[in-house]
A protein has these predicted regions:
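Short, charged/polar surface micro-motifs in flexible loops or helix N-caps
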Residues: 39-40, 49-52, 70, 99
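A conserved, well-ordered hydrophobic junction motif at loop->secondary-structure transitions
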Residues: 48-49, 53-66
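Short coil/loop residues immediately preceding or within conserved phosphate-binding loops
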Residues: 29, 88, 116-118
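Active-site helix/loop of acyl-thioester processing domains in fatty-acid/polyketide metabolism
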Residues: 62-83
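Non-catalytic linker/capping segments at the edges of enzyme domains
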Residues: 1-45, 49, 150-152
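HotDog/MaoC-like acyl-thioester-processing domains
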Residues: 1-11, 80-83, 97-99, 104, ...
Length: 152
């Protein structure tokens, strides 16, 4: 007699985002935190510290871009537990990020088909609500589980 193999439940988006955060050195370096995670949407927060400033005292654009990449990467990988990598992104800087404030990154999956996905990330000052940047990113899914599915 062959024993039946129980079905394997894929991890949910929040579990995947938490796992990615715990295993991502850039997430730790930027002192990010998870505010919300669901399938197709992730919201992260990052304090704007003096170490992230440019020559003129505003948040360095490259740090804003790195944070946005984390936001849409977490969103894409968590939606279906399939590994993906950023293949392109475009950023529109709208206002300077101010040292001493918190930057919020709200990423949303806008389209996904086959091995490709498009994501929008809205980056805003948490206190004032001022929009700091908007990023449009493209993800290429390379296959494989982000984290292995767990048996119930």
């Amino acid at each position: 007699m062959i024993d039946a193999v129980p079905p394997v439940a894929p991890p949910d988006a929040e579990t995947i985002v938490r796992w990615m955060a715990a295993n991502n050195p850039v997430f730790a370096l930027l002192k990010c935190e998870i505010r919300h995670a669901s399938s197709g949407r992730t919201c992260l927060a990052m304090p704007i510290t003096p170490e992230l400033a440019n020559t003129f005292g505003a948040m360095h654009g490259g740090m804003i871009f790195a944070f946005a990449d984390l936001c849409f990467g977490f969103t894409a990988n968590a939606a279906q537990n399939v590994k993906g990598v950023s293949s392109s992104a475009e950023i529109h800087w709208l206002a300077p990020g101010k040292v001493g404030t918190t930057l919020i990154g709200d990423a949303k999956e806008t389209w996904r088909e086959g091995r490709n996905g498009l994501y929008d990330v809205y980056l805003a000052d948490e206190e004032s609500g001022e929009m700091i940047a908007i990023v449009h990113g493209r993800m290429r899914f390379i296959g494989g589980d982000v984290i292995p599915a767990q048996s119930d």
